[in-house]
A protein has these predicted regions:
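Intrinsic-disorder/low-complexity accessory segments
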Residues: 1-323
Length: 323
């Protein structure tokens, strides 16, 4: 990790930049993980090659350095080399980033599981949190500096102190209880939770994701403030959504059944295709995608390669492949 800023190819990189040396015994492993990947556009279907552009799928910036002279100047500002235990200790010591004025109000960047979990914790504690509705921070959260301090040490947050009079926001009334579809029945023999652990991947992943973000979950749709998940909705959940329950559905099971909920929707899946990285555009800026737009997230990972080939004229398209 660099201890001072340095300049390479006209770009200045700050202290704290991670450097992975190719002068090590396992350099091929590191290069295999970090190289830019292989673009194959001559085949319409490809299963055997996994996506290797980890910087794009995992969300970090990466630059390859191939000039010996630059190795020396960059190495000169690096700290000691780290092994696995050192890396774990380093990440454990990371703290939230705060800029701007203290003792005013705080913009929390809506950029991670931690930011959502922090907001949910504040809401459950009866604190006031808003979502910014316009301007450069549209889609981010805002709270008091005192409330920010109660969660800053528990989560990794990007925050900026601001004068609230310059920010337009809508108060979030509560931390929503989320219905996760597809709750498996308990086993009648042996370990009762076997279906949940080993036979219900979609439900399991969704439940884990909601827990990571601090949401309370329920298997009873009548007790939910929203629904989200990869499993197809049952009859009761469909009725609730049609009656106005907010719903986030993804995966083939959910997307292919969208026509059951909304007239005029058609879903198309490329036969045999698996996944891809695709450039995207955002046709409409809303509170749902504003933080993606602000962060310049113009490449997204797609699993399953299904897409909505037709939507109603009244629909708001949030993201679109720009192939």
């Amino acid at each position: 990790v660099t201890e001072k800023e340095f300049t390479y190819d006209g770009v200045t990189y700050p202290a704290g930049t991670m450097i992975v040396s190719m002068y090590q015994a396992k350099r091929s492993v590191a290069n295999g993980v970090l190289y830019d990947g292989t673009l194959i556009n001559g085949w319409t279907i490809l299963y055997s090659e996994g996506i290797t552009s980890f910087n794009e799928t995992r969300g970090f910036d990466m630059v390859a350095v191939a000039e010996p002279a630059a190795y020396k100047s960059i190495s000169a500002v690096c700290g000691d080399a780290m092994d696995h235990d050192d890396a774990l200790a380093y990440t454990k010591a990371l703290t939230s980033c705060f800029t701007g004025d203290k003792n005013k109000d705080v913009i929390l960047s809506n950029a991670s599981e931690d930011s959502t979990a922090a907001v949910n914790e504040l809401l459950k504690a009866g604190k006031t949190v808003g979502m910014v509705t316009s301007g450069d921070h549209m889609g981010d959260f805002i709270c008091s500096y005192a409330d920010y301090q109660t969660v800053a040490g528990k989560y990794l947050l990007s925050a900026a102190g601001v004068d609230k009079t310059s920010v337009k926001a809508k108060i979030i009334t509560k931390s929503p209880t989320v219905y996760v579809p597809g709750t498996p029945a308990e086993s009648e023999k042996g370990f009762v939770y076997t279906p949940q652990i080993s036979q219900s991947a979609g439900w399991n992943y969704d439940t884990a994701a909601m827990n990571l973000m601090g949401f309370t979950t329920t298997s009873d749709v009548t007790k939910a403030d929203a629904a989200a998940g990869a499993t197809k909705l049952d009859a009761a959940a469909k009725t609730a959504v049609k009656n106005g329950l907010p719903y986030i559905g993804y995966s083939y099971s959910a997307a292919s059944s969208a026509s059951d909920l909304i007239a005029g929707v058609e879903y198309t899946e490329l036969d045999g295709a698996m996944d891809c990285l695709t450039p995207v555009v955002y046709p409409n800026k809303t509170l749902v995608n504003a933080s993606y737009i602000a962060d310049g997230d113009d490449i997204l990972y797609a699993y399953g390669l299904g897409y909505f080939s037709k939507v109603p004229a009244s629909a708001t398209v949030l993201v679109k492949s720009d192939k």
